[in-house]
Amino acid sequence: MQVTFTLVAALAGMASAAVAGERGSFGCATHEPTLEHIEISKKLAEEEATNATLFGLAAAATITVPTYFHVVASSQTVANGYITDKMLSDQLAVMNEDFAPHGISFNLVQTTRTINPTWARDGDELAMKRSLRKGDYGALNLYFLRDIGGAFGYCYFPTTASPGSASYIRDGCTILSSTVPGGSSTNYNLGRTVTHEVGHWFGLYHTFQGGCTGSGDSIADTPAQSSPSSGCPVGRDSCPNQPGVDPIHNYMDYSIDSCYEEFTPNQQTRMYSFFNQYRA
């Protein structure tokens, strides 16, 4: 079932700015959401609370995402990013396992393999994606690269993007190839980097977005968090004056892969809201 929600027209236009900003160089390198995109999330939160029954129907629906894997390596060795079919199959299984409780599944349509040392180290992103990208704006393209400048991955939030535009072409997630199941990134090689980044593709922010004050990640059932977690610090409470302890098991924190367990019900609703608004 597909349920589409209409935001104020001006807000839809604001989303075109959502891909602005700088990527970091530690952990997740997804752009910080712009003020305009944060405003869209706040409005969605208001609509979700006001129309709980309608949004509940959306969250009870199912989404099947056409998915394309692009392996971009500097040579035909795993060490240089040429990950195996088994590693990719295991990665897809992790994605489907993590999102299945929320009615979301990923159907792998095609896998491409490219040897290009420049692209394999995240050089000339737009040219690479212009050459490799498949499907429409509702299709998920994952680019597995050998080196992303010290980061594990980055992705792009849903936005208003016309076919052929830079925002449309850049859409998708770039993933460090050594983070897939069986990869060499210690503590981060169970495939949960993809789960985290795809959460961004569905419009979710980090659980520590905004720190201890304000609207945070604009999700009512994720406790406030002042900063990213490291490892799996059970009981960590970085916002002691706010309800709850840090959501260290949430896929949108920075915990190690074995610590990750969940998206919340309100995160599920938000994923459906953004998908139906921009990608359906």
From Swiss-Prot:
It is an enzyme of class 3 (hydrolase). Keywords: Disulfide bond, Glycoprotein, Hydrolase, Metal-binding, Metalloprotease, Protease, Secreted, Signal, Zinc. One of its GO terms (molecular function) is metallopeptidase activity. Disulfide bonds join 232-259. It is found in: Secreted. Zn(2+) binds at residues 196, 200. Its EC number is 3.4.24.-. It comes from the Eukaryota. GO terms for cellular component: extracellular region. Residues 1-17 form the signal peptide. The active site is at 197. Its main location: secreted. PANTHER family: METALLOPROTEASE MEP1 (AFU_ORTHOLOGUE AFUA_1G07730)-RELATED, PTHR47466. Secreted metalloproteinase that allows assimilation of proteinaceous substrates. Belongs to the peptidase M43B family. This is Extracellular metalloprotease GLRG_06286. It comes from Colletotrichum graminicola (strain M1.001 / M2 / FGSC 10212) (Maize anthracnose fungus).
